[in-house]
Curated annotation (Swiss-Prot):
Catalysed transformations (reactions): ATP + H2O = ADP + phosphate + H(+)
GO BP terms: DNA recombination; DNA repair
Keywords: ATP-binding, Cytoplasm, DNA damage, DNA recombination, DNA repair, DNA-binding, Hydrolase, Nucleotide-binding
Membership in a protein family: Belongs to the RuvB family.
Enzyme Commission designation: 3.6.4.-
Primary localisation category: cytoplasm
Species of provenance: Salinispora tropica (strain ATCC BAA-916 / DSM 44818 / JCM 13857 / NBRC 105044 / CNB-440)
Protein name in the entry: Holliday junction branch migration complex subunit RuvB
Span list, region Large ATPase domain (RuvB-L): 1-183
């Protein structure tokens, strides 16, 4: 994985096996998300006492926070099997019907990116979630017939990074909805120490703190940075991940103290140096950094906005005062602070000018 996507919250095919090796297996091993963890524990324990599958579960939140891990944990806590698929992989209702009819009693069906499931398949899923039955249409035209098929009672765990794209009928069929939040630096340090033990990586407390501060509040990024720092420590140091080793390694990979990579800094630098801090339109900003507008909007902006370095305004993107200082630039007098004239109220009435 290159430095440009080292801090991406999305997982690549090449790192799935490595990521799985440090994934928590049980709810007690899952770090942080105390509210969600407690609620989920009540749901699962209640289902086990009754001897019936729990309500269908919807997990929402940014990528890399543990939605897939929680889906596997649900199956482990219930002592059942899990079937894993994704919304884009289910193109036809027949694909989904084949999966549903192959489930055993009490099994967990995990659909990642459930908001991207095809509409015909989604409509088939409604009856399966509510009545544990699917109607498979055989034939076409006036001669088509619907054959009802029973489905074993199961639990659907859906994961989405964009809950707003779920249709109302789909959202309403989930009996338990949980939103995962970004991790605190302290929680990420705990997670890094656990991952280091599993991977056999010697790490100091200040080394874990240094990595956690650059991980954007995301466990997947924290574990990825740990593996890259481990490589540096083994090749160019004594094998121990210390603060100094982590700083040197992440400098090589162009990840700065705030977790910004090359593209993030390019966006801020263009805003400040080329457009005097903005406002500037998204398309113009993308051209300035040599990227597609959707790359800037979907890859860079979410973290820059959350970090308080960039603001989206009706007139365009604006670099905040924190962005200027992070780049080591001094904003012109009056750019920020009490000397800035207040924004005009759209509905204010000004006296007529002579």
């Amino acid at each position: 994985m290159t430095g440009d996507n080292l801090v991406s919250a999305y997982v690549s095919d090449a790192e799935r096996d490595v990521e799985a090796s440090v994934r928590p297996r049980r709810l007690a091993e899952f770090i942080a998300q105390e509210r969600v963890r407690d609620q989920l524990d009540l749901l699962l324990q209640g289902a086990l006492r009754r001897g019936s599958p729990p309500d269908h579960i919807l997990l929402s939140g940014p990528p890399g926070l543990g939605k897939t891990s929680l889906a596997n944990i649900v199956a482990a806590e219930l002592g059942t099997s899990i079937r894993v698929t994704s919304g884009p992989a289910i193109e036809r209702s027949g694909d989904l019907a084949a999966i549903l009819t192959s489930l055993g009693e009490g099994d967990v069906l995990f659909i990642d990116e459930v908001h991207r499931i095809a509409r015909p398949a989604e409509e088939l899923l409604y009856s399966a979630m509510e009545d544990f039955r699917v109607d498979v249409v055989v034939g076409k035209g006036p001669g088509a017939t619907a054959i009802p098929l029973d489905v074993e009672p199961f639990t659907l765990v859906g994961a989405t990074t964009r809950a707003g794209l779920l249709t109302g009928p789909m959202r309403d069929r989930f009996g338990f909805v949980a939103h995962l939040d970004f991790y605190s630096p302290a929680d990420l340090e705990t997670l890094l120490n656990r991952s280091a033990r599993i991977l056999g990586v010697p790490i100091t407390a200040d080394g874990a703190a240094e990595i956690s501060g650059r991980a954007r509040g995301t466990p997947r990024i924290a574990n990825r940075l740990l593996r890259r720092v481990r490589d540096f420590a083994e090749v160019r140091a004594d094998g121990v991940v210390t603060r100094e080793t982590a700083q040197a390694a992440l400098t090589v990979y162009d990840v700065d103290a705030l977790g910004l990579d090359r593209l993030d800094r390019a966006v801020l630098t263009a805003l400040v140096d080329l457009f005097r801090g903005g406002p500037v339109g998204l398309s113009t900003l993308a051209v300035a950094v040599g990227e597609q507008p959707d790359t800037v909007e979907e890859v860079c902006e979410p973290f820059l906005v959350r970090a308080g370095l960039l603001a989206r305004t009706p007139r365009g993107r604006v670099a905040t005062e924190a962005a200027w200082h992070h780049l080591g630039r001094t904003p012109a007098n009056g750019t920020f602070g009490p000397d800035v004239p207040p924004a005009r109220d759209l509905f204010s009435v000004e006296p007529d000018q002579p």
